[in-house]
Curated annotation (Swiss-Prot):
Its main location: cytoplasm. The modification N6-(pyridoxal phosphate)lysine is found at residue 292. InterPro entries: 4pyrrol_synth_GluAld_NH2Trfase, Aminotrans_3, PyrdxlP-dep_Trfase, PyrdxlP-dep_Trfase_major, PyrdxlP-dep_Trfase_small. Transmembrane segments: none annotated. One of its GO terms (molecular function) is pyridoxal phosphate binding. It comes from the Bacteria. HAMAP family: HemL_aminotrans_3. Keywords: Cytoplasm, Isomerase, Porphyrin biosynthesis, Pyridoxal phosphate. This is Glutamate-1-semialdehyde 2,1-aminomutase. PANTHER family: GLUTAMATE-1-SEMIALDEHYDE 2,1-AMINOMUTASE (PTHR43713), GLUTAMATE-1-SEMIALDEHYDE 2,1-AMINOMUTASE 1, CHLOROPLASTIC-RELATED (PTHR43713:SF3).
Length: 466
C-alpha cells in the first residue's frame, strides 16, 4: 500500500504543486496532504486507512454529510439516463424555481426572480460583474479587502497605496487592476469617500455576505444594509456573494437570515454579541451568486437576481455567458435532492452541533490561557489566534497564525480533519452525531497545548491560500 507521502510525491510529477487547488497542499501548516479514499456521513478515510471526523466537508457543500443515500440515489438514477446532454432539462427548471422561492426572508421578500446556472462560483461572480457593468454602463467595481470571489482576473486584486488595487497574482494585467477598487471591510467611511472620488463611475459593490475566507468575520450590525443603501444612492448595484453562505447558514442563506432579524427580537443575532432590531433593515441586493451547497457536492454555480438585470443575459440580452456543462443533470439532481432534504430540522441540528463545538473550543483555549477567538454565522465558524476578534483583513492577518500548524497537526493525529489554513471556515454537517462531537472535543486539550507551545514567530502577513 502506498502512503500519503508517496502519492503526494507522485502527484507533484504530473500536477503543478501536486494539487488542483492550492490550499490542499498543506503549505500553510506543513506536512503531507491526506489523500482521501472514501467518505461517509461525518467521516472521511485516507488511503492509509485512517478515519477522521471531517470539518472541511468539501469546503462547505455537504450539509447532509458525505454520501447521503438519497443524494447518491438521485445522482445514480440520473446518470443511468445520461451523464450530460448539452440541452435543456427539467431538472434545471426545477432547481431554478426552488431557489427563486427559497431565497425569501421573514418579510416575504424574494429578490431572486431569475437564475442562471453555471459550473463554478468563480463563473457566477465573474458573470455578475459583467451584468452590473452592462446594466449601469460603468466600468469600476468595488470589493472588500480579504473577500474572496474566485480566481477571475478582476478579483485577484489587493489594496494598493491608494484605493486603486494592484494584481495579487501573476498574469493579471495592471489594466484590469485599475478597474477594481479595494476598500477595508467593515469601514463605511472609506466606502463613502470612494463614491465621492469616483462619481458615476462605479458599477457595483461585490461583497461576501459574511466573509469566510479570512476566517469567519461577520459584518458589523447594519453594515450590509448601509452598504446597500450607499451603493444604491449612487446608482451602483449590490452583488451578494453567497457561494459559501447560500443554503449553508440557513435555508435562505445569510441575506434571509440577517434581514429576517428586523422583525424578530433584538437578541436573535446572526453572530456573537447583541444587536438592536433597528440595526437591520430589509435591504435587497440586486444580484446574488451561489455555488457549493447548490450542487450537493458536485460542480455548480449560479447567478440570480432582479429580472430586469438577469434578462440582459444572452440569448435574451446582450451580455454573453455560456457553458458546455452549465446546468448539467448530475449536479442539478444532487442539488435538488440536497435542498429538498434540507428542512428546518437539518439547520437546527447543524446549529446545535456548531454551538456545542464553539463552546468547547472557547473553554479549551480559555483554560489553557492561549489567546483565541471564535466567530460564527449560523453553523459556519472559524478561529483566530488573537485576543480580540478580527473585524477586517488587516486584523485577521495580524493574528498569531503560526500557532495553527501545531494545533492542526495535533487534531489530525487525533482523527480530526480541519481546514489546512487558519483563514478557512470550519464546516459541520447534519451527519454529526455525539460520537463525532466527542472525538473533536477529546482532541482539543492536546491540540490547544500544542498551539500554546508553538515557538513565537514575528508577526507578519501570511496570505490566505484557496
Amino acid at each position: 500500500m502506498r502512503t500519503n507521502f508517496e502519492w503526494f510525491e507522485e502527484a507533484k510529477r504530473f500536477i503543478p504543486g501536486g494539487v488542483n487547488s492550492p490550499v490542499r497542499a498543506y503549505a500553510a501548516v506543513g506536512g503531507t496532504p491526506r489523500f482521501l479514499a472514501k467518505a461517509q456521513g461525518a467521516y472521511v478515510t485516507d488511503i492509509e486507512g485512517r478515519e477522521y471526523v471531517d470539518l472541511v466537508s468539501s469546503w462547505g457543500p455537504l450539509i447532509l454529510g458525505h454520501a447521503h443515500p438519497k443524494v447518491i440515489d438521485a445522482v445514480i438514477n440520473t446518470a443511468h439516463r445520461g451523464m450530460s446532454y448539452g440541452a435543456p432539462t427539467t431538472l434545471e427548471v426545477e432547481l431554478a424555481e426552488l431557489v427563486c422561492n427559497r431565497i425569501c426572508n421573514a418579510q416575504g421578500i424574494k429578490p431572486v426572480e431569475r437564475l442562471r446556472l453555471v459550473s463554478t462560483g468563480t463563473e457566477s461572480c465573474m458573470t455578475a460583474i459583467r451584468l452590473a457593468r452592462c446594466f449601469t454602463g460603468r466600468d469600476l467595481i468595488v470589493k472588500f479587502s480579504g473577500h474572496y470571489h474566485g480566481h477571475a482576473d478582476p478579483f485577484l486584486i489587493d489594496a494598493g497605496s491608494g484605493l486603486v488595487g494592484h494584481p495579487s497574482s501573476g498574469g493579471v494585467p495592471e489594466s484590469v487592476a485599475k478597474n477594481t477598487l479595494v476598500v477595508p471591510y467593515n469601514d463605511l467611511a472609506v466606502l463613502e469617500y470612494l463614491f465621492e472620488a469616483y462619481p458615476n463611475q462605479i458599477a457595483c459593490i461585490i461583497t461576501e455576505a459574511c466573509p469566510a475566507n479570512m476566517g469567519v468575520i461577520p459584518p458589523d450590525p447594519g453594515f450590509n444594509a448601509r452598504v446597500a443603501d450607499l451603493g444604491h444612492s449612487h446608482g451602483a448595484l449590490i452583488i451578494f456573494d453567497e457561494v459559501i453562505t447560500g443554503f449553508r447558514v440557513g435555508s435562505g442563506g445569510f441575506w434571509a437570515l440577517e434581514t429576517s432579524l428586523a422583525s424578530q427580537q433584538p437578541t436573535q443575532a446572526v453572530s456573537e454579541g447583541s444587536v438592536s432590531d433597528s440595526a437591520y433593515s430589509a435591504y435587497v441586493p440586486d444580484l446574488f451568486t451561489f455555488a457549493k451547497v447548490l450542487g450537493g457536492g458536485l460542480p455548480i454555480g449560479a447567478i440570480g437576481g432582479r429580472a430586469e438585470i438577469m434578462d440582459l443575459l444572452s440569448p435574451s440580452g446582450p451580455v454573453y455567458q455560456a457553458g458546455t456543462l452549465s446546468g448539467n443533470p448530475l449536479a442539478t439532481a444532487a442539488g435538488l435532492a440536497t435542498l429538498r432534504l434540507a428542512d428546518s430540522n437539518i439547520y437546527e441540528h447543524m446549529n446545535r452541533v456548531a454551538r456545542a463545538l464553539i463552546n468547547e473550543i472557547q473553554s479549551a483555549f480559555h483554560d489553557a490561557g492561549v489567546p483565541c477567538t471564535v466567530q460564527s454565522a449560523g453553523n459556519l465558524f472559524g478561529i483566530s489566534f488573537s485576543a480580540i476578534a478580527p473585524r477586517d483583513f488587516t486584523q485577521a492577518t495580524s493574528q498569531e497564525h503560526w500557532r495553527y500548524s501545531n494545533f492542526f497537526h495535533s487534531m489530525l493525529n487525533s482523527g480530526v480533519l480541519l481546514p489546512p489554513s487558519v483563514y478557512e471556515a470550519w464546516f459541520v454537517s447534519a451527519a454529526f452525531d455525539d460520537r463525532a462531537i466527542e472525538r473533536v472535543v477529546n482532541a482539543l486539550p492536546d491540540a490547544v497545548r500544542a498551539a500554546g507551545s508553538a515557538p513565537a514567530r514575528p508577526k507578519g502577513f501570511e496570505p490566505p491560500t484557496f
